Each structure stands twice: as C-alpha cells, then as structure tokens.
Amino acid sequence: AEKLGIKCYDKELLELAAKESGLCEELFASQDEKPTNSFLYSLVMDTYSLGYTNSYVDMPINHKVFLAQFDAIKKLAERESCVIVGRCADYALEDNPYAVSVFIKASLDERVQRIKRIYELNDSKAADLIQKTDKRRASYYNYYSSKKWGEAKSYNLCIDSGLVGVDGAIDMILKFIELKEKNMGKDI
C-alpha cells in the first residue's frame, strides 16, 4: 500500500463497517473473523436461511457483522484504491474487475521467526499463535465464501514470501498490478 501511495485497511475496516451499518463497534471486534463452525449452531441459528424467517432482525449477529463488512468493503473499493487485509475481501470484490486478490504464505518455521521478533514470544507460543490464527481465518473464509482459504485458485496471485522475502513479495505484487493495468489498458 505504501509503495502504491494508497491506504491499507485491516482493523480499520471494523470501525468503518460499524459506522456505516449502525452496529456497535465492539460487536465487530468480538466477531472479527470468528464464525461458528458448529453444525448444531448453524441448524438452530440459521433458520432464517431455510425460509422460516427472512428478516435481518432475526439474523445471527455473526452474519450481520459479516454482511456489514462485506458492504463496507464494496463501498470502500468503489470510493478509492486501497489494500484490504483479510475479511473475505477477495470474495466481496470478486466481480470488481480492478480488484487484485493475493495470498501470501511461508513455512511455519519462517513465520515462527517473524512472529517471535514482532511479539517477543518463544518458539512454542509463536507456533501456537500462528496455528490458532490460521485455523480461525480458514474457518471464517471457508464458512462465508464459496472458496477455500489458502487454495491457489481462490486468488489472482499466490506468493511464498519464504522464498522471495517480503520485498520480493511486494515487487511481485507491484509487477502483477503493472501487467494487469497494461492488459486492461487503464490504471487499477
């Protein structure tokens, strides 16, 4: 985002979605990328999707939060060029011809080293944090999108930052955008 001179939205998206939806910002923080993966919960709470009710009022709170974020992502992309981290942004923008979806991966060992530096954790705690975060993100993404988290066909570009480094990943993304703009005949 910095090299493109555009904003990057991560947690900031929660505040924006809360403002635009009128829902309490704390709801977004508590539900952030945390769907339920309980089949029983879905059966009980998702009765509205089976035709028993069709009211937004009756919708489970995690669905309301997701829809508010989904709408905020679409509106944000219409207003400005930006980078949006996570929250199924690629799914929300899959019909936007200017969107570029990127998945960046690295080996667990490389990620542990990075997390240790950032959060001052030992190997075990860093690995545990990574695995729990990955599980939560995959569950959220797979639950709300028609895609699979981390699967190459779900994204325009997948990069192994362990092989090319952070700067190499940035260069690859910038080159991808440059080539897409050239192919489209306009700036994205």
Language-model-detected regions and their locations in the chain:
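Small-molecule kinase domains that catalyze NTP-dependent phosphoryl transfer to phosphate-bearing small molecules
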Residues: E33-D46, N122-D167
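A conserved segment at the C-terminal end of the G1
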Residues: A1-G5
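Conserved phosphate-donor/acceptor-positioning beta-strand/loop module used by diverse small-molecule
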Residues: D95-I118, D123-Q131
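Short, amphipathic alpha-helical "lid/cap" segments that border enzyme active or binding sites
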Residues: F70, V166-L174
